Amino acid sequence: MGNSLISLLSIFHLLVLWGSSVNAYWPPSPGYWPSSKVGSLNFYKGFRNLWGPQHQRMDQNALTIWLDRTSGSGFKSVKPFRSGYFGANIKLQPGYTAGVITSLYLSNNEAHPGFHDEVDIEFLGTTFGKPYTLQTNVYIRGSGDGKIIGREMKFRLWFDPTKDFHHYAILWSPREIIFLVDDIPIRRYPKKSASTFPLRPMWLYGSIWDASSWATEDGKYKADYKYQPFTAKYTNFKALGCTAYSSARCYPLSASPYRSGGLTRQQHQAMRWVQTHSMVYNYCKDYKRDHSLTPECWR
């Protein structure tokens, strides 16, 4: 009886320790869920194929796109927006995906070639046994064209993005850009000047493509097409905001309960946890960079 009781207490102690360990590696609740304020959008009503139509398949309202040796694929929103909430549930492919980029992003590249704005969520493919890297980026007025001035922040997620769908979103307002994962803010990019913030209308895009020259460990590992096709699945599309044609009275959704924007204290705590435990690169802390080109880092 005594030994049995000791064994049970030992098991209970281990479970408590295990639970504490799990919670230690999971962000605290943000306390507010902006995705719940936006209804899902039928893919055919909100988007169109951009390229690689033969590498795109719909099953009800779940979209699969894939990359093989012949082509990748991409889609684009029908409407351009000047602000709004943009998201989707995405599930990534496990295994060897080095060199492959899966993305959800805002851009006006087709409207302003060589001088465009862009706000990115990109999943950088990986090798066996290593996690994906989620890269967020902001380009302003051609900083992604020719002379690259990226504003990258990279994260290793606290879950396996190949096991299930998770919701990834960009909330873009005239004051700030907030990147969210399952409604947890992971990055806030405030407007500090017109020269460092995208203000022109953009479209929402998604794509899968070969970026072997840089995607995985700066191009060390390339796409290997013996593992093709490389797939990505999207569902629960959300795109709600002020279009390029909306009146000046149109007001974008906020990431928090505050109509004026910003984040609550609880959301800040969740974001701080992510940036402490999951962020692996911050362009503002890269001292090899010329930060005269990124003045928002020192203002």
Swiss-Prot record:
Disulfide bonds: C242-C250, C284-C297
Residue(s) at site: Important for catalytic activity: D120
GO molecular function: hydrolase activity, hydrolyzing O-glycosyl compounds; polysaccharide binding; xyloglucan:xyloglucosyl transferase activity
Catalysed reactions, as listed in the record: breaks a beta-(1->4) bond in the backbone of a xyloglucan and transfers the xyloglucanyl segment on to O-4 of the non-reducing terminal glucose residue of an acceptor, which can be a xyloglucan or an oligosaccharide of xyloglucan
InterPro entries, per database record: Beta-glucanase/XTH, ConA-like_dom_sf, GH16, XET_C, XTH
Catalytic class of the enzyme: transferase
GO annotation (BP), single: cell wall organization
Signal peptide: 1-24
Post-translational modification: Contains at least one intrachain disulfide bond essential for its enzymatic activity.
EC number: 2.4.1.207
Pfam family, one: XET_C
Protein's cellular compartments: Secreted, Cell wall; Secreted, Extracellular space, Apoplast
Keyword terms: Apoplast, Cell wall, Cell wall biogenesis/degradation, Disulfide bond, Glycosidase, Hydrolase, Secreted, Signal, Transferase
Chain positions recorded as xyloglucan binding sites: 122, 135-137, 145-152, 213-214, 289
GH16 domain location: 25-234
Catalytic residue positions: E118, E122
Tissue specificity annotation: Predominantly expressed in stems.
CC annotations in GO: apoplast
Protein family: Belongs to the glycosyl hydrolase 16 family. XTH group 3 subfamily.
More details: In contrast to group 1 and group 2 endotransglucosylase/hydrolase proteins, it may not contain the ligase activity, and may catalyze endohydrolysis xyloglucan polymers only.
PANTHER family in the cross-refs: XYLOGLUCAN ENDOTRANSGLUCOSYLASE/HYDROLASE PROTEIN 8-RELATED
Function, as annotated: Catalyzes xyloglucan endohydrolysis (XEH) and/or endotransglycosylation (XET). Cleaves and religates xyloglucan polymers, an essential constituent of the primary cell wall, and thereby participates in cell wall construction of growing tissues.
Name of the protein in question: Probable xyloglucan endotransglucosylase/hydrolase protein 32
Upper taxonomic lineage: Eukaryota, Viridiplantae, Streptophyta, Embryophyta, Tracheophyta
Gene that this polypeptide is encoded by: XTH32
